[in-house]
Design a protein with these regions (language model features):
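Hydrophobic alpha-helical membrane segments
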Residues: 1-278
Length: 278
């Protein structure tokens, strides 16, 4: 019960920041459309050029690896860039300012080189772990999963470090690991669960909305079923956007607390309790 209570307090604290600057939710929206542009830029030309057929036939494996790696890099870059913009804007709010979308984009733009470098590092780690996982057995996949989880913990604060301290991507990873170890130990606690709460909400929407949609469709209310299905889709999108925004805000608040020992919107004891000491 204490974990559930802490999780809810985290959501409410992040929610207060989001209410103060509702435009922060625009960053995940822009990031989504930018990611779709990256997908279209890579896959549509390859599809029409017949590259996929050659890769599946085994005649262009090297080309497939190169293109796949480049795709990973640019997709990571888009994600990190707009997440950096979100975190940068959230930092302004946490420091008592009143940020705008242009403020966040400006901050991310000032560190575009470091963000791209970090995207290259993250893409490299991701491809290596994925390649090993595909060739490993069940035990090996478990080990790779643990390594991936450890990597996510070690890089938890990289984005705010890049946009606030202006260091390079390698130093950003090192600094992130140092801050987590110094302040909370090396492992995230299970009660850090904004993702869990929204996962449950999304599951509930899918379960209830899906059931209602099926019932109305079976009963012959076709247009009502279509309307319900669209409503479920819109609700899932909204929940996803809010969850992404809250996670970015929480990351900024954790960084602020890790470096200053305080945070305007978060109770320090609550933030501490979301991590377990080693």
């Amino acid at each position: 019960m204490s974990r559930i209570r802490n999780s809810w307090e985290l959501v409410k604290a992040s929610w207060r920041v989001l209410l103060a600057d509702k435009e922060l939710v625009l960053f995940p929206i822009i990031s989504f459309f930018a990611s779709m542009i990256v997908v279209a830029t890579f896959f549509l030309p390859m599809l029409f050029a017949g590259v996929f057929d050659a890769i599946f036939a085994g005649g262009a494996q090297v080309l497939g690896l190169v293109v796949g790696f480049a795709f990973y890099i640019f997709l990571y870059f888009v994600t990190f860039f707009f997440n950096s913009a979100l975190v940068g804007a959230a930092m302004i709010r946490l420091e008592g300012g009143d940020p705008t979308v242009s403020d966040g984009l400006r901050i991310a733009g000032q560190h575009v080189g470091s963000i791209f470098g970090y995207a290259v590092i993250a893409a490299t780690v991701g491809m290596i772990l994925r390649a090993i996982s595909e060739r490993a057995g069940i035990l090996g996949q478990i080990v790779i999963g643990i390594i991936g989880f450890a990597w996510n913990i070690a890089t938890f604060l990289v984005v705010p470090i890049l946009v606030v301290e202006g260091v390079g991507p390698v130093d950003g990873v090192k600094r992130s690991a140092e801050l987590l170890k110094k302040t909370w130990g090396e492992q995230l606690a299970g009660n850090f669960s904004i993702g869990l709460i929204f996962g449950l909400l999304i599951f509930g929407v899918i379960l209830a909305g899906g059931a209602l949609t099926v019932v109305t469709a079976v009963a012959g209310f076709t247009w009502l079923a279509i309307t319900l299905a669209l409503l479920v889709l819109v609700t899932l999108i909204v929940l996803g956007l809010i969850s992404s925004s809250l996670n970015g805000i929480f990351t900024a608040a954790v960084y602020q607390f890790a470096t200053t020992g305080e945070s305007k919107y978060f109770d320090p004891e609550m933030v501490k309790s979301t991590f377990k000491q080693k």
